[in-house]
């Protein structure tokens, strides 16, 4: 066995031809020495092998530790760079979401969404509880037919307070009620206008429609109240009007007074006959003209009496104003009559 091992290690060369070695060859070493040297060589080879394996394992551990350290360093540096970049850009929501503050914000957001849901359930269209719901509803629904109602901002200087969060539930209700509004929103937002601006312009025009309806209703109420007060005042003033109003038309009384004054003036004038007809005969005036003038006077008096009767059906204020005008007219007519009488007297005096 040792011989085969020594031959494997190259310690002994076989002799060619199986002959005896030459006489000059050194004497053969003892087998025990060969075995010991072989064992030493095997031990040295095993030690070297173990040393080599230990070196390889140490190198492997060193390389692994170096690679792990490098990866950890790179990961820490990358994380630090990401945090720095997020802080600079303000995108720290992802980091905050992983903390207690993030959990609190999630709960708060959930609570706000629940409140929005409750408001949406309680929200109603803008035309509810108005005076004329049907008319206002038609006018509001007609706004969705023209996109200018959503693109044009309120005029400059107009104070229109719009809270998007507060009106958001109403907007959701209107999207359900008005299909054309939903299509208009899909076509305009966000291509031509922002979401908040879209609803601001829309609800501004809705408020104009509601204000117009309120003003119309208020004007109608004031008009009805004024008519009622007027009728009540007329009923209250009716007894006083009956007491103050003369039993006979004022024109008739004035005509009688005017006749008496004419008679007095004619009777006191010198050289004048007792009656006006005598005076006309004395002057040789045209009887036809005189008759026409008298008829005209009668017609004028009848017209005045008819006007007075028509004025009796008007209200008290108009009657008072009309009576004042009649007094002025009578005064002017009296002045004309006086001038006419003076002319007659002058003519009679010239004839005499």
Swiss-Prot record:
Main location: cytoplasm
Stored Gene3D superfamilies: BSD domain
Residue numbers bearing the Phosphoserine modification: 269, 313
Compartments it resides in: Cytoplasm, Perinuclear region; Golgi apparatus; Perikaryon; Cell projection, Axon
GO cellular component: axon; cytoplasm; cytoplasmic side of plasma membrane; cytosol; dendrite; extracellular exosome; Golgi apparatus; growth cone
UniProt-listed InterPro entries: BSD_dom (IPR005607), BSD_dom_sf (IPR035925), BSD_domain-containing (IPR051494)
Annotated segments matching region Disordered: 1-45
Keyword terms: Cell membrane, Cell projection, Cytoplasm, Differentiation, Golgi apparatus, Membrane, Phosphoprotein, Postsynaptic cell membrane, Synapse
Residue ranges constituting the BSD domain according to the UniProt record: 158-210
Protein's job: Plays a role in adipocyte differentiation by promoting mTORC2-mediated phosphorylation of AKT1 at 'Ser-473' after growth factor stimulation.
Designated name of the protein: Synapse-associated protein 1
Annotated organism of origin: Homo sapiens
Lineage: Eukaryota, Metazoa, Chordata, Craniata, Vertebrata
